[in-house]
């Protein structure tokens, strides 16, 4: 049986990376592909998460013996020596979920101005930019220059690179990765059998924001936009992060109109009866699983035109797209859907159709099998 080994820091759902690993592992196993998991740190739901894999072990234990898997896929590994060790153990691909491998600031936008970056990695320039972050144990000369450059060298030496969007493919080409080494594999999104239409299910209507509560996700921009609105609403915020306390203080003038629910490893229930999901991202979102997940539930989107959002937010069809950082335009777009539940429902239905056409199990499996046929001798033998 062909085998693949997923390697990531966490055993357990912390964000979209782990949710992607979990769902993809289940689909690949059903297709007859063995999937193992290696990790550095267990989370409270590690046992549930690891049940999606055939076998699991720590990274330290995995590197003590040869692997019988045909391909190793690194999802979140931030240590150069560890990347090298897995790379030297056999065919290795890197799944680029975000900007952390080529931006020592990790966010791929500039400090102070918070304008998005478009440059290729340069050890000196990017290291200096990273030093402008707030003081922390990680914000050191060694981490920003020497260690980061070593990590990027090891990552670039891997055999293949996997991304979720054409947007990220373009960024990797800009970073000097050969086009032939990059594979775009769209995620598979579950389509629920029934949805609650984003119409007058609640009064006032509910909006939803899901994701880590960090600056790059832009929830502060969403709160700024909400303060400009006159239409009643309730914003449900699902997620946690290091900006949570600041966001709660910022939301105080909005009173009961903003509710923080904390983290949810399976947020499907949060989509029920929601008028719109808002994607107020500041950073260039590499994909944003929450977008097509919302559409799968028949919920339209409102978001800033950054990153890979155009892969699923078709302006006027599956939601409303506004210029990056324009909180006044964001407020107007949200109010448009709050005022017109029929339009919101139509956009949600179109989004559900788009997801069912584009983000399918079969498309995901074709992508992974194509990758295996390139890198895995065992897969070549077992594929008709």
Give a label for each model feature:
Residues 315-316, 320-327, 336-341:
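Conserved acidic donor-binding segment of nucleotide-sugar-dependent glycosyltransferases
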Residues 16, 342-373:
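A charged, aromatic-enriched C-terminal amphipathic alpha-helix characteristic of glycosyltransferases
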Residues 18-23, 205, 209-228, 242-245, ...:
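A conserved mid-protein helix/loop that constitutes part of the nucleotide-sugar donor-binding site
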Residues 246-264:
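Nucleotide-activated donor-binding/catalytic signature segment of Leloir-type glycosyltransferases, i.e.
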Residues 300-303:
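Short hydrophobic beta-strand element within catalytic cores of glycosyltransferases
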Residues 124-194:
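Donor nucleotide-sugar binding/catalytic pocket of nucleotide-sugar-dependent glycosyltransferases
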């Amino acid at each position: 049986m062909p085998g693949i080994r997923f390697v990531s820091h966490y055993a357990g759902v912390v964000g979209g990376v782990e949710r992607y690993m979990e769902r993809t592992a289940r689909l690949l196993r059903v297709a007859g592909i063995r999937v193992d998991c290696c990790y550095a740190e267990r989370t409270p739901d590690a046992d549930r998460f690891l049940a999606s894999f055939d076998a699991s072990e720590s990274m330290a234990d995995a590197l003590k013996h040869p692997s019988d898997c045909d391909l190793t896929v690194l999802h979140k590994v931030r240590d150069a020596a560890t990347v090298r060790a897995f790379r030297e153990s056999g065919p290795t691909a890197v799944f680029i979920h975000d900007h952390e491998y080529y931006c020592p600031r990790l966010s791929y936008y500039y400090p102070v101005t918070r304008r998005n970056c478009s440059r290729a990695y340069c050890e000196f320039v990017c290291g200096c930019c990273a030093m402008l972050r707030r003081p922390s144990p990680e914000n050191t000369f060694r981490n920003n220059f020497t260690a980061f450059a070593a990590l990027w060298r090891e990552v670039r030496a891997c055999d293949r690179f996997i991304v979720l969007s054409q947007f990220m493919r373009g960024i990797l080409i800009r970073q000097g990765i050969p086009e032939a080494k990059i594979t775009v594999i769209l995620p598979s999104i579950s389509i629920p059998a029934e949805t609650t239409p984003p119409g007058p299910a609640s009064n006032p209507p509910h909006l939803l924001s899901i994701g880590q509560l960090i600056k790059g996700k832009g929830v502060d921009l969403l709160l700024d936009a909400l303060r400009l609105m006159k239409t009643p609403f309730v914003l449900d915020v699902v997620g946690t992060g290091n900006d949570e306390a600041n966001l709660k203080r910022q939301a105080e003038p909005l009173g009961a109109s903003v509710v923080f629910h904390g983290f949810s490893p399976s947020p499907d229930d949060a989509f029920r009866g929601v008028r719109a999901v808002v994607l107020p991202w500041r950073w260039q979102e590499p994909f944003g699983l929450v977008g097509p997940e919302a559409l799968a539930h028949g919920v339209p989107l409102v978001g800033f035109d950054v990153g890979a959002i155009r892969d699923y937010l078709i302006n006027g069809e599956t939601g409303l797209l506004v210029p990056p950082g324009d909180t006044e335009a964001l407020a107007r777009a949200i109010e448009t859907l709050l005022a017109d539940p029929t339009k919101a429902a139509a956009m949600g239905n179109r989004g559900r159709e788009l997801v069912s056409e584009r983000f399918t199990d079969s498309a995901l499996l074709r992508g992974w099998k194509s990758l295996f046929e390139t890198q895995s001798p065992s897969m070549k033998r077992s594929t008709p």
